[in-house]
């Protein structure tokens, strides 16, 4: 009969672990003592850990600290994790030690046991690969976890959020160009204002997302600084003098991103301003997306009793009781994502402020919330673009009706009859239920021909020289 469990040991003693699991005693202890919630460490973070463990093995070998055969086993096991294998062997919750020590050891143990399996050894024997002595060589949880945080953050921004945000920006720009010739009434304070084109309105959305993309680039330099090499408190104890610089170069080589060794490891371990700054950028992007989504659902409200200027794609039934009802569901999903991102940023900001002396011990909750925001925004932008923006259509007759009946067209008369007289025209038209033109003529302020020459909505969308 095959044993269902094996014995794993750590400095506190021995524990039984399921025979088919690659983790060891420290991971098992974490499962026992931190059964809190259902949030586990993100796969992106585990992959980042595997990258840094591979880079550390290569660097330690190059510096003469790790034998080539051991380095090769670690590299092979790490490569499998980088490729997406063994993710079910990383079960630990976010809610653990604030340095992420249990997750660092989870990675060390899985890589060590997988390396042992590759060479035909006995799982749990720590021979020929020891999780601490070999996989964790020249490292501490205190510098590996923040390093993995930055690797995961940069990779997520570059491969997920930037492409998704750029695609949404480009689709909005296509609509801006398509709608350039459609003049509509503007609105401020949710009230009628002077005209602009629908293309101009959409160009504002494009500019907001351009600003978001620019802000992402502003936050990347801080995220490209790595804590690895600081070891326990930032001094680099038990690492080679060249380790920090060389391992950062190796990580840059492996990822294709320009990572460097953080110039001050004490700050890199005890503070997380770079992630807090980047989270602030995500919050700013969420603010832009909230505005865009709200505008589109307001302009698409109706179909008969709302603004109805835009026809939003009808993707699914909107009500379980009202037949034929269709709702702006993509806008609603987007706005919920935005408020979640804002909440995540509040958590990150507070957690980043909680460093004490040489270490911040809120690391897992910081990266959990950051990657959550990043993925939500990436997915929401893709969904919003595909299922709403691409299929947007304009109800031009509705747009024209609002434009033609707006009292705020009277603003064009200011240079000709003065602000006070123009206000009188608007109030008279509203009170008597007549047109601006009729009110102005009845008040004796101008002729019909003058009104037609001066009040031309299409000429009110840009500055005009006197």
UniProtKB/Swiss-Prot annotation:
Family: Belongs to the class-II fumarase/aspartase family. Fumarase subfamily.
Gene Ontology molecular functions: fumarate hydratase activity
High-level lineage: Bacteria, Bacillati, Cyanobacteriota, Cyanophyceae, Synechococcales
Pathway terms, separated by semicolons: Carbohydrate metabolism; tricarboxylic acid cycle; (S)-malate from fumarate: step 1/1
UniProt protein name: Fumarate hydratase class II
PROSITE patterns per UniProt: FUMARATE_LYASES
Subcellular location: Cytoplasm
InterPro entries cross-referenced by the UniProt entry: Fum_hydII, Fumarase/histidase_N, Fumarase_C_C, Fumarate_lyase_CS, Fumarate_lyase_fam, Fumarate_lyase_N, L-Aspartase-like
Remaining remarks: There are 2 substrate-binding sites: the catalytic A site, and the non-catalytic B site that may play a role in the transfer of substrate or product between the active site and the solvent. Alternatively, the B site may bind allosteric effectors.
Lyase is among the record's keywords: yes
Described function: Involved in the TCA cycle. Catalyzes the stereospecific interconversion of fumarate to L-malate.
Keywords noted in UniProt: Cytoplasm, Lyase, Tricarboxylic acid cycle
């Amino acid at each position: 009969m095959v044993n269902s469990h094996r014995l794993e040991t750590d400095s506190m003693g021995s524990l039984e672990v399921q025979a088919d699991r690659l983790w060891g005693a420290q991971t098992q202890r974490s499962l026992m003592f931190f059964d809190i919630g259902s949030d586990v460490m993100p796969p992106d973070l585990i992959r980042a850990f595997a990258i840094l463990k591979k880079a550390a093995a290569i660097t330690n070998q190059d510096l003469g600290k790790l034998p080539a055969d051991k380095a090769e086993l670690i590299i092979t096991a790490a490569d499998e994790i980088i490729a997406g294998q063994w993710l079910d062997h990383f079960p630990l919750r976010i809610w653990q030690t604030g340095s992420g020590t249990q997750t660092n050891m989870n990675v060390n143990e899985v890589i060590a046991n997988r390396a042992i399996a590759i060479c035909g050894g006995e799982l749990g024997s720590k021979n020929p690969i020891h999780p601490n002595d070999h996989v964790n060589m020249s490292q501490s949880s205190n510098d590996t976890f923040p390093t993995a945080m930055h690797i995961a953050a940069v990779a997520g921004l570059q491969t997920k959020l930037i492409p998704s945000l750029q695609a949404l920006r480009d689709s909005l720009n296509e609509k801006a160009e398509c709608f350039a010739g459609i003049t509509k009434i503007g609105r401020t304070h949710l009230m009628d204002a002077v005209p602009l084109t629908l293309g101009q309105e959409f160009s504002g959305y494009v500019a907001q997302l351009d600003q978001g993309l620019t802000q992402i680039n502003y936050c990347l330099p801080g995220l490209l600084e790595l804590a690895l090499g600081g070891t326990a408190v930032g001094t680099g104890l038990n690492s080679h003098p060249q380790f920090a610089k060389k391992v950062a170069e190796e990580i840059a080589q492996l990822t294709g991103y320009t990572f460097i060794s953080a110039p001050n490891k004490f700050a890199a371990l005890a503070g997380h301003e770079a992630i807090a700054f980047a989270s602030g950028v995500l919050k700013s992007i969420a603010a832009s997306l909230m505005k865009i989504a709200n505008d589109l659902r307001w302009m698409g409200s109706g179909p008969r009793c709302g603004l109805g200027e835009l026809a939003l794609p009808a993707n699914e039934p909107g009500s379980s009781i009202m037949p034929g009802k269709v709702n702006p569901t993509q806008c609603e999903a987007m706005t919920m994502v935005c408020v979640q991102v804002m909440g995540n940023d509040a958590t990150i900001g507070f957690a980043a402020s909680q460093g004490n002396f040489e270490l911040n011990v809120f690391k897992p909750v910081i990266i959990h919330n950051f990657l959550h925001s990043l993925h939500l925004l990436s997915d929401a932008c893709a969904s919003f673009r595909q299922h709403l923006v691409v299929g947007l259509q304009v109800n031009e007759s509705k747009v024209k009706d609002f434009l033609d009946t707006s009292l705020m067209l009277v603003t064009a008369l200011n240079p000709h009859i003065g602000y006070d007289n123009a206000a009188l025209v608007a109030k008279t038209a509203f009170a008597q239920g007549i047109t601006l033109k009729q009110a102005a003529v009845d008040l004796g302020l101008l002729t019909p021909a003058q009104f037609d020459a001066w009040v031309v909505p299409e000429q009110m969308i840009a500055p005009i020289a006197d």
